[in-house]
C-alpha cells in the first residue's frame, strides 16, 4: 500500500469513527444540531441514550431555565451545551485537554452560545480550587471522569470542600457500571438515586435546601 493510500485509509477510518461518535443536541432551541468531538479516541462522549436519560430525570426535579452549570471532564461539552440549549444561563466547562477545549470552543461558536460559557483548561483539582476561591456556586454539576481513571469520588469531596454546589443544587456523576460502587455523597449532600443505562451508571446527588430557622 502506497503512502497516499495509507493516508486515505487513516482519513476514512477517522471519518467513520467521527460518524459513530457524532453527537446531536437532543432538545431545546439547538435541537438536532451536531456537536464536534475532540480529535482522537481518548475522549469518551456521553451517549445520546445516556444524555437523554439524564435530562429526563433532571426535568422532573429541577427547572433548567436560568441555572448555572459546571461541566467537569467536559470532553466535547455535550452535557453543558445540552443544558444551554434547554435554558441554562451559563456553563463553566473544565477539562485539562486543549483538544477538548478547542472542540468545546468550536461547538459553542457554531451554536452562538459563546457568551454564555467559560472554558477552564486545567487539571480538575486546581480548577475546582480556583472556582472555590472565587466563591463560584452552581445549580447543576456534571462529573464525567474517564472510566479508566475514575476520579469521581475525589471530585465529589472537592465539590463539598469548596462549597461549589448551591442549596437545592444537583450533581450528576457518570461512571462505568463495572465500577465498584457509586461514590458516597460529599458533606452536606445526599445521594438521591442511582440509575444504570447501558454501560453507564449514573448517580444523582442533591444538596438539600437548608431548613428554615426557628423564630
Regions found by a protein language model. Give the residues of each.
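Class I S-adenosyl-L-methionine-dependent methyltransferase catalytic core
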Residues: 2-215
Amino acid at each position: 500500500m502506497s503512502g497516499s493510500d495509507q493516508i486515505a485509509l487513516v482519513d476514512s477510518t477517522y471519518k467513520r469513527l467521527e460518524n459513530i461518535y457524532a453527537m446531536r443536541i437532543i432538545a431545546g432551541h439547538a435541537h438536532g444540531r451536531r456537536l464536534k468531538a475532540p480529535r482522537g479516541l481518548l475522549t469518551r462522549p456521553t451517549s445520546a441514550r445516556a444524555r437523554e436519560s439524564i435530562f429526563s430525570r433532571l426535568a422532573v426535579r429541577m427547572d433548567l431555565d436560568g441555572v448555572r452549570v459546571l461541566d467537569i471532564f467536559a470532553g466535547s461539552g455535550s452535557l453543558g451545551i445540552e443544558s444551554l440549549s434547554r435554558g441554562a444561563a451559563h456553563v463553566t466547562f473544565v477539562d485539562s485537554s486543549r483538544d477538548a477545549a478547542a472542540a468545546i470552543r468550536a461547538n459553542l461558536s457554531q451554536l452562538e452560545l459563546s457568551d454564555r460559557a467559560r472554558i477552564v483548561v486545567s487539571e480538575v483539582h486546581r480548577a475546582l480550587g480556583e472556582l472555590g476561591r472565587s466563591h463560584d456556586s452552581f445549580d447543576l454539576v456534571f462529573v464525567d471522569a474517564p472510566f479508566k481513571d475514575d476520579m469521581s469520588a475525589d471530585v465529589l469531596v472537592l465539590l463539598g470542600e469548596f462549597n461549589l454546589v448551591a442549596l437545592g443544587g444537583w450533581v450528576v456523576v457518570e461512571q462505568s457500571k463495572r465500577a465498584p460502587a457509586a461514590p458516597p455523597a460529599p458533606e452536606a449532600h445526599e445521594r438521591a438515586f442511582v440509575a444504570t443505562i447501558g454501560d453507564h451508571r449514573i448517580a444523582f446527588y442533591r444538596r438539600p435546601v437548608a431548613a428554615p430557622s426557628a423564630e
